[in-house]
């Protein structure tokens, strides 16, 4: 019988893959972003509105020396996770992540989904030649070769059946589309009423999304064991 022996959680922010000298670029991206969503209300604010509400002390933290130290700290923390994982030597990794508009679209958007095919493909991220240095650095933070990752189908099926028995409305999948694409609508409250935007993704070759492939690269260090991916 399977036992839960180790739990690990990690961010997979692009900043974790990028050198500290590129971190300031995210402020420029935020100025262009029309979907700056703030907790706990989920309200959408413009960059200027967010700046007015922000703690003024944050400005003192926005410099290269502090970013460099923060990058060193996050690298050390992820290395610690990788060492903990390696030393524990798990037989199976149940991996829970958010799709973030990569594989699931509004033609079928499950609340949560358990994958129980025999394996799941990963395809390397390939930025355009004219992509920004930040985008290239992010892509390099994921596995650089195509992978066929084994799935522990018996455990995955057990999770599906257990959840059904306990009245959870769980979705399941034994395979993923080779060239997924579609639309996802985002709806947020704002001072002027609800804002709705639609993100369109053209069909393209895609496999295991980045929330999981980041862990494969940085925590598992591409030493593959059977996994159970849960969306």
Question: How would you describe each model-predicted region?
Answer:
Residues 2-231:
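Active-site histidine-anchored catalytic micro-motif
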């Amino acid at each position: 019988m399977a036992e839960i022996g180790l739990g690990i959680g990690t961010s997979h922010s692009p900043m974790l893959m990028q050198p500290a000298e590129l971190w300031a670029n995210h402020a420029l991206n935020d100025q262009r972003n029309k979907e700056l969503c703030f907790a706990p209300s989920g309200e959408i604010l413009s960059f200027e509105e967010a700046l007015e509400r922000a703690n003024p002390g944050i400005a003192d933290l926005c410099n290269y020396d502090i970013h460099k130290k923060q990058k060193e700290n996050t690298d050390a923390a992820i290395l610690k996770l990788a060492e903990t994982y390696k030393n524990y030597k798990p037989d199976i990794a149940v991996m829970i992540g958010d799709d973030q508009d990569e594989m699931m679209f509004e033609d079928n958007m499950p609340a949560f989904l358990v994958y129980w095919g025999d394996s799941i493909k990963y395809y390397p991220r390939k930025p355009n030649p004219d992509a920004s240095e930040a985008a290239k650095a992010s892509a390099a933070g994921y596995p650089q070769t195509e992978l066929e990752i084994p799935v522990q189908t018996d455990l995955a099926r057990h999770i599906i059946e257990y959840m059904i028995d306990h009245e959870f409305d769980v979705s399941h999948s034994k395979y993923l589309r080779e060239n997924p694409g579609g639309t996802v609508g985002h709806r947020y409250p704002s001072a002027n009423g609800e804002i709705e935007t639609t993100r369109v993704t053209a069909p393209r070759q895609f496999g295991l999304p980045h929330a999981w492939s980041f862990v494969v690269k940085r925590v598992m260090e591409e030493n593959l064991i059977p996994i159970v991916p849960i969306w």
